[in-house]
Amino acid sequence: YEISLGLVGSEMCIRDSSMTRIPAEDEAVTAPSPPLDNALAQLSAAVKTLGYDEGLHQMLAAPRREMAVSIPLRRDDGSTEVLRGYRVQHNFSRGPAKGGVRFSLDVDLDEVRALAMWMTWKCALLDVPYGGAKGGVTIDPRQYSKAELERITRRYTSEIQPIIGPEVDIPAPDVGTDEQTMAWMMDTYSVNVGHTTLGVVTGKPVSLGGSLGRASATSAGVVHVALAALEHLGIEPSQATAAVQGFGKVGAGTVELLEAAGVKVVAVSDQYGAVRDDEGLHYDALQKQLWDTGSVKDTPGTASMDADELLEMDVDLVVPAAVQSVLTEENAPRVRARLVVEGANGPTTGEADRILAEKGVLVVPDILANAGGVIVSYFEWVQANQAYWWSREEVDERLKQRMVAAWKAVLATSESRRVSLREAATLTAVQRVAEAHRT
């Protein structure tokens, strides 16, 4: 069914898609966006391998609920514009929906549908009791003042409030949003319901019920999986070399934690350039250079290098932790690392994936490798519901347990079915959601 509600100064559409079906091949439909096309193709392949019937396939593919809202904004200069926002809840079979809110010009309904589906699989793979959701507003946040972003966030929260809540759908930060955004969302929701509700979002400041360890969780998850994969390959951390593409939140944290684990990080890049030191780079020096100049480029005691060559270095481990589609059909044949751990979302194209598999390069997919943030978001939600907060050591240890358990499950599926880790991760996740639905 569909419901349209006319609101003062706004528009809201809620669509319950539990009965939505995938169009037949001969039906005329609007072509899906590439992310949604990829998500549906991955699901179809998993369903075929698992031998599920078409009815279950339809259930797994269809978003459970979709919402599109109009957000009137009065700019600081007095002008008014109307923005578009979305929230898609893909699946509730394993628990309330969970997923980020992004502020980006790329946000549209098809992208949000795809990201919500991928969140369902990620939560299931990590054995976190959530379904998948995603949301966002179609803006470039750099073009708005802090006051304007607050107004956008608060109005967006009020509009999607009918379908979110600590037992229904729990938003979190994503591209273009941060802990301040989550603080505004939590405050707006709490004011609207009449009481403080810490568990309505995760990724909040620690002072408002956020979890210790949340800021570094994604990087920590990357490193936990990387160390487990190195062990699987028979490589001691103290003997391993690594190259990390990206020195943002994920990349910088990965460099710091790899160094602490004894791995020699010999190359690092950011959007402005790359540096190398075959004797090993040091996180503190890179971070100081970043603070002083805005880039790791020209860090004292290092040599400059072509950033494009970083992914092709003769190292044990490569961590793409910047942007998507950096490992391609063109450069994959030149990759010499034995292990690629995807810290970024979608850094490896399908063509590159096939080439790396043929070369015997082990690729740990993003759905597993960068899932640490989702796990600690779950921990934050649990702590908020209990009104009891864990120590940093407890958070770190429980994160490690979850990441290693997920790695072992994916590896076991990969070996038993003789498929790549990426295929194994999707199969494991889809199977868990299907079992929950059918139980």
Predicted feature locations:
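Glycine-rich phosphate/diphosphate-binding loop of Rossmann-like nucleotide-binding domains
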Residues: 210-312
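Adenosine-phosphate binding glycine-rich loop
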Residues: 30, 229-230, 334-439
